[in-house]
């Protein structure tokens, strides 16, 4: 009854006003699943390919008509008749049809749209919410939100080099209370910034994007906001960084250039810089602390801080099991960021999560800077027992939609649900 009977696609807009792919998959029960594909601003060099049209006369070359056509003309004929409930077989068919390592023929945005829409159609046909359909009866853990309340780097036009400064409400009893905590700190931060004469416009992910003197000043104003909101730093609320270090790494010179504060580091110097920040502030997680191909500095960072902090590989791993396996083998990082569009199918995403968990790595489900109203990743965070989710600040509907879905899931789970809290961070146990 969950045989795929129709697949269609269209071009829609994401939260940055750029085109993206939306797919609908219909199954024999009459149920339809719809999925919209996200898009990143700072993308890893090793990510699956997001197919764009390249026609500068239309959407500045960012149109996705080619990807849409590939769904309708290439993928649909190949998957109609397949069982949407057999996710692995469906994804394998599309991957084989593409035949390239990075899904560059059909586009990862085309393949992923079909993959996610089919899962949603099958879930509806089985009368199950997506988190239960994908995760089974054991899916009951609500993730800790890593809320990006202050933006720098590629996500904002400012002189702050680190891309994301996040508050982590890990000491609250429920997801709903954690979300309230994050929202109240977000509003308190606006007052703090206004008091300093700083701008309170927001970046791609809903966090403020002020021009501050240094990365450390960004941490200091967030600490002030936590206190003004009435929460205890370190106990109730911690901090997390997404450094996006590949964005400020000079590959030729082998140096990390923090231009906003006029500092230049080699690998050892960068590790010590992070260690000093972690000693001064209640930082529990550092993401993309080193360049995506600087395995040597990643190793140094893991040896120096891996026993104390969560070290997350995003651009380093790009949700790819081959790169993750290398990291596990070399003892690099202790966590992986999970982005469905980095690898381009639900099956491969789930494989990466399983590999990480087997190795004792934590997993963080994540949005992209270009998002839509689609809430799939909220369900996947619960389904995969990730324990943590990154989906932006307490503003912009494209971010809030995911938080609201998690509120619904927590309500639906009732007493069987649990908020991951501090236990989500293995390095803190």
UniProtKB/Swiss-Prot annotation:
Its cofactor is Mg(2+). Its EC number is 4.2.1.11. It comes from the Bacteria. The keyword Cytoplasm applies. (2R)-2-phosphoglycerate binds at residues 163, 339, 368-369, 390. GO terms for biological process: glycolytic process. Mg(2+) binds at residues 242, 287, 314. It is found in: Cytoplasm; Secreted; Cell surface. The active site is at residues 205, 339. It catalyses: (2R)-2-phosphoglycerate = phosphoenolpyruvate + H2O. InterPro entries: Enolase (IPR000941), Enolase-like_C_sf (IPR036849), Enolase-like_N (IPR029017), Enolase_C (IPR020810), Enolase_CS (IPR020809), Enolase_N (IPR020811). GO terms for cellular component: cell surface; extracellular region; phosphopyruvate hydratase complex. Binds a second Mg(2+) ion via substrate during catalysis. Pfam families: Enolase_C, Enolase_N. Pathway: Carbohydrate degradation; glycolysis; pyruvate from D-glyceraldehyde 3-phosphate: step 4/5. Keywords: Cytoplasm, Glycolysis, Lyase, Magnesium, Metal-binding, Secreted. Coiled coil: none annotated. GO terms for molecular function: magnesium ion binding; phosphopyruvate hydratase activity. Catalyzes the reversible conversion of 2-phosphoglycerate (2-PG) into phosphoenolpyruvate (PEP). It is essential for the degradation of carbohydrates via glycolysis. Belongs to the enolase family. This is Enolase. It comes from Anaeromyxobacter dehalogenans (strain 2CP-C).
